[in-house]
């Protein structure tokens, strides 16, 4: 009933479950997932988030990343696997098609790259990331009031902050 005020979203979520089809997954095919998000962990480094489109994978499996053209970006090993359940990230030993996961072990892979087993040559279709539209040049501040406003304004600290942000932000390259 649209006129009645609701306390929660249960009715809407039930409608979504009733009318939205489940995603089609292919368990039999070799492992493949599309990287849709970058994450960073202070112990694991760069992590990649996405949904497993097909197959399954285990910790220590050898995988490769390929770009939208099918060119190899890098090879590596799945050092850690996490599965998302709601907003919780839970460490697991294996993942299957349909799971939303986070993986560690690939440092050069980015959003829109396909992570797959080593025999797969076909990338998952995705929208390419737009190239940067702006660039900046940072130079030494030779103003007479340099260093008087702000605490972290040295070039080294700014560089460290930009590199840290580039780990999880695809808009910075």
Language model features with spans:
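Structural and coupling elements of P-loop NTPases
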Residues: 1-173
